């Protein structure tokens, strides 16, 4: 499935962007919002929503305390989004996963490294640790400093099915393309890119058409 990343100042703007795009899913980067009122307006789109409130340490747009993030996750989970994304290293991980499972939302447990792509052994151990938490999908994203980093991250697909793994940055685009064919969810930009090297929806569709994997 393709998830278009939605960056917006308000819920109203987020809905306008959702309506302007045709996508399987929409990742609402709630950490980009300035106004959290009227969350209930998102309920008609809940089956297509991936709610992410990214921490500043892992690429979030602003500093939010753990208490505030947990409060926001709880409010967003009241509309029962299809997926909720929370960081593996987050102190509120267990609470968010518990609430999500109680309301029937699926959990994406994520790890982001903006500095490097660790050695394969480190990545493999990380994958095992993350899988043991019981999330529906594991997401591992690293920074590519060289083309070889793509190979390390792609190798993870040998050992997991419900995995999203790719490298960020201009040197990581090949892993994003590979991920689009083997991951349960592929992230694309609508207008403003949320991460280095991210493809737009149209760019991805052109690439998949060439590869015979059109969606």
From Swiss-Prot:
GO MF term list: 3-dehydroquinate dehydratase activity
Source species, domain of life: Archaea
GO BP: any one term: chorismate biosynthetic process
Binding residues for 3-dehydroquinate: 27-29, 54, 176, 198
Enzyme class: lyase
Entry-linked Pfam families: DHquinase_I (PF01487)
Residues the record marks as active site: 112, 139
EC number(s) from the headed UniProt entry: 4.2.1.10
Signal peptide segment: none
The protein's annotated pathway: Metabolic intermediate biosynthesis; chorismate biosynthesis; chorismate from D-erythrose 4-phosphate and phosphoenolpyruvate: step 3/7
Keywords: Amino-acid biosynthesis, Aromatic amino acid biosynthesis, Lyase, Schiff base
UniProt KW Lyase keyword: yes
Chemical reaction(s) catalysed: 3-dehydroquinate = 3-dehydroshikimate + H2O
Family as reported in the entry's similarity comment: Belongs to the type-I 3-dehydroquinase family.
Summary of the function given for this chain in its UniProt record: Involved in the third step of the chorismate pathway, which leads to the biosynthesis of aromatic amino acids. Catalyzes the cis-dehydration of 3-dehydroquinate (DHQ) and introduces the first double bond of the aromatic ring to yield 3-dehydroshikimate.
Subunit structure of this chain's protein: Homodimer.
Official protein name in the record: 3-dehydroquinate dehydratase
Gene: aroD
């Amino acid at each position: 499935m393709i998830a278009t990343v939605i960056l917006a100042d308000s819920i109203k703007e987020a809905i306008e962007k959702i309506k302007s795009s045709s996508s399987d899913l929409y990742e609402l980067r709630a950490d980009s919002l300035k106004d959290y009122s009227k969350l209930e307006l998102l309920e008609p789109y809940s089956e297509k929503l991936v709610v992410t409130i990214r921490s500043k340490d892992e690429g979030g747009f602003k500093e939010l305390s753990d208490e505030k993030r947990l409060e926001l996750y709880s409010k967003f989970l009241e509309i029962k989004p299809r997926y909720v994304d929370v960081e593996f290293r987050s102190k509120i991980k267990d609470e968010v996963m518990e609430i999500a499972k109680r309301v029937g939302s699926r959990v994406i447990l994520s790890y982001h490294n903006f500095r490097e792509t660790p050695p394969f052994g480190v990545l493999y151990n990380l994958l095992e640790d993350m899988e043991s938490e019981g999330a529906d999908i594991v997401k591992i994203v690293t920074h590519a400093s060289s083309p070889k980093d793509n190979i390390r991250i792609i190798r993870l697909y040998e050992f997991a099915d419900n995995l999203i793994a790719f490298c960020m940055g201009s040197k990581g685009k090949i892993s994003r393309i590979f991920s689009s064919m083997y991951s349960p969810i592929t992230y694309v930009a609508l207008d403003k890119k949320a991460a280095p090297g991210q493809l737009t929806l149209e760019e991805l569709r052109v690439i998949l058409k060439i590869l015979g994997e059109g969606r």
